[in-house]
């Protein structure tokens, strides 16, 4: 997909995260569930899909004609990084045709000792036409990743790193400051549970939104409502 066409398609819109980890009820070994989630999202007006693993991404791209933000979650010894951590995952995501390749952009080092910014620079050197999104938690991380070549910066990791522990609600001030200071397009992701929050995130300066738990993870949403 042409970059400008993609930008125009997702601007101001809702990207739905369709993911199920192995311990979750909607996970199956053969897949097939997340493409159905993606179809439902597409029929309801989603402008894109965020998905994990080559299998799910491939099945989703066959099911819907929407841009896909692709990741591969994998734990590595010696680092808290787990979202598209090495070039091996990058190669696999590029090979399956992700429209936007998302990587963890937080301050921890990767297994080879590289920073998120260095990793993004390496991706852009190898795949100069590939759109890259950095999942960040702080203003400084977002700026560093954008300066390294990230086309999008997501607020995905805010509240999930030692530096941002306790940030359990969507922070509109953070989104606004990030949109003012960071040269990349900002994608608000994480802690968005209600339509009013989505609207305020866009008003704060987000280019687009990613929502998962409130739409495609019934366990997460039920827990939120029940407690």
Which residues fall in each region the model found?
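Catalytic beta/alpha-barrel core
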Residues: 47-53, 82, 100-112, 131-137
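Surface-exposed amphipathic alpha-helices with a cationic face
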Residues: 7, 42, 57-62, 117-127, ...
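Conserved small/polar residues in nucleotide/adenosyl-binding loops
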Residues: 222-227
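Short loop-to-alpha-helix "cap/lid" segments that border enzyme active sites
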Residues: 116-122, 137-139, 147-155, 165-183
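Short beta-strand/loop segments at the ligand-binding rim of alpha/beta enzyme cores
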Residues: 13-14, 64-75, 125-133, 181-189
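Conserved N-terminal beta1-alpha1 strand-loop-helix module at the mouth
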Residues: 2-88, 140
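Glycine-rich phosphate-binding active-site loops on the catalytic face of alpha/beta enzymes
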Residues: 102-109, 154-163, 206-221
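Catalytic cores of alpha/beta
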Residues: 88-89, 139-148, 193-206
């Amino acid at each position: 997909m042409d970059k400008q066409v993609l930008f125009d398609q997702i601007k101001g819109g809702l990207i739905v995260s369709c993911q199920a980890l192995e311990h979750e009820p909607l996970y199956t070994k053969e897949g097939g569930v997340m493409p159905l989630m993606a179809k439902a999202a597409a029929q309801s007006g989603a402008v894109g899909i965020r998905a994990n693993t080559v299998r799910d991404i491939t099945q989703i791209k066959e099911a819907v004609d929407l841009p896909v933000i692709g990741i591969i979650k994998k734990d590595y010894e010696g680092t808290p990084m787990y979202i598209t951590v090495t070039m091996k995952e990058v190669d696999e995501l590029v090979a399956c045709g992700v429209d936007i390749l998302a990587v963890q952009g937080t301050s921890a080092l990767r297994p080879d000792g590289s920073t998120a910014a260095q990793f993004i620079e390496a991706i852009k050197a190898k795949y100069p036409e590939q759109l890259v999104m950095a999942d960040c938690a702080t203003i400084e991380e977002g700026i560093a990743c954008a300066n390294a070549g990230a086309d999008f910066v997501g607020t995905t990791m805010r509240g999930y790193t030692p530096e941002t522990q306790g940030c359990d609600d969507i922070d509109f001030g953070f989104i606004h400051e990030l949109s003012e200071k960071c040269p990349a397009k900002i994608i608000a992701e994480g802690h968005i549970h209600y339509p009013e929050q989505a609207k305020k995130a866009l008003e704060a300066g987000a280019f687009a939104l990613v929502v998962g738990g409130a739409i495609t993870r019934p366990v997460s949403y039920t827990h939120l409502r029940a407690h």
